[in-house]
A protein has these predicted regions:
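Bacterial N-terminal signal peptides that target proteins for export
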Residues: 1-8
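C-terminal motif of bacterial Sec signal peptides marking the signal peptidase cleavage site
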Residues: 15-19
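Acidic/polar, low-complexity intrinsically disordered N-terminal segments immediately downstream
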Residues: 20-99, 247-291
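Auxiliary, metal-adjacent structural segments of Zn-dependent hydrolase domains
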Residues: 24-25, 81-136
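Surface-exposed patches in mature extracellular/periplasmic domains of secreted proteins
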Residues: 95-113, 172-173, 177, 234-242, ...
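Short pre-active-site segment immediately N-terminal to the catalytic Zn-binding motif
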Residues: 142-162
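Active-site recognition of the HExxH zinc-binding catalytic motif
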Residues: 155-176, 221
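Metalloprotease/metallohydrolase-associated module, dominated by Zn2+-dependent proteases
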Residues: 187-271, 279-291
């Protein structure tokens, strides 16, 4: 998919758009300069991203890589260091752990991660959390608002990362066509944020998130990314809140997601979730501020 977005009120979007034009560039933000010298962080990225995973991690905002339809601010250096370390611990190494090596990520994960400091707001009241382009590049926004809290990290960064990666996996090896038939004509395309105002409303209709109701591929990856970043209690409570009809639909679709990952990629989503949740509990133990 091209863009993963989160619904916000139109009023909030207008206020933020009107105020951001007055902001001055933070001196800690990084804009690309072709003559810039490699620093300690660049060397660390080479050792921890390029060499083991063949992933280019771009924290200096490159205009050629940025969406010029939005007013964007570069990512701050300190926040870039933090998210780079968190991404390895909470995402890349979790897959390494359950697959037994770095080869899975090296082969299938996008080859470029691009950071943007600010959010990207649309005129219709939605906010872009991340974008993916052809399975080769993921752009993450709101880096300057980074908070070291698991729920916040999942909502604004890692749910998006797993969502976009899941797209690459199903585009590489398709899932069963039976999945799309379950909700069939219930998908609402671009009107999802008008049709489902709350998660609970989407659950009761058989969708794990309002955005998952847009079309089958989004439904598939939303199920996967929500499951592996959520606690078993959340999942159980969600199914209860979904009611008899909604929970049956969600469970039927998730069985296909689970078996697809197990049989096609040899990844048990329960094991992956356990690894991610355990690693989330280790955030306070990480040295995120120094290279």
């Amino acid at each position: 998919m091209a863009k993963y977005i989160k619904y916000l009120s139109a009023i909030l979007a207008i206020v933020l758009l009107s105020s951001c034009v007055k902001d001055e560039l933070n001196p800690n933000s990084q804009v690309i300069d072709s003559s810039v010298k490699q620093n300690e962080f660049d060397e660390w990225l080479s050792e921890n991203y390029v060499l083991p995973y063949n992933i280019e991690f771009i924290y200096r905002m490159e205009y050629i890589e940025s969406d010029m339809n939005y007013y964007l601010v570069p990512a701050e250096y300190d926040k870039s260091v933090q998210i780079a370390k968190l991404m390895i611990h909470l995402c890349l190494e979790a897959y390494d752990e359950v697959t037994g090596s770095k080869e899975f990520i090296k082969t299938y994960f996008p080859k470029m991660i691009h950071l943007i400091g600010s959010a990207a707001y649309r005129n219709n009241g939605t906010m872009v959390l991340g974008t993916a382009e052809g399975g080769l590049k993921i752009t993450l926004y709101m880096i300057n608002s980074l908070k070291l809290e698991a729920d916040y990290l999942n909502e604004y960064y890692f749910h998006t990362m797993h969502h976009e990666f899941a797209h690459i996996l199903h585009q590489t090896k398709p899932y069963s066509s039976d999945f799309e038939m379950i909700s069939g004509s219930d998908y609402v395309k671009d009107t999802w944020n008008d049709v489902y105002k709350t998660d609970e409303a989407a659950w009761q209709a058989g969708f794990i998130t309002p955005y998952g109701s847009s079309e089958a591929n989004e439904d598939f990856v939303e199920l996967l990314s929500t499951y592996i970043t959520s606690t078993p209690k959340f999942w159980s409570d969600m199914l209860t809140a979904a009611g008899k009809t909604g929970s049956a639909i969600i469970s039927q679709k998730f069985d296909i997601v689970y078996n697809y990952m197990k049989n096609t990629w040899k990844i048990d989503l329960d094991d992956l979730r356990d690894s991610i949740l355990r690693r989330q509990g280790e955030i306070d133990q990480l040295n995120l501020d120094t290279i």
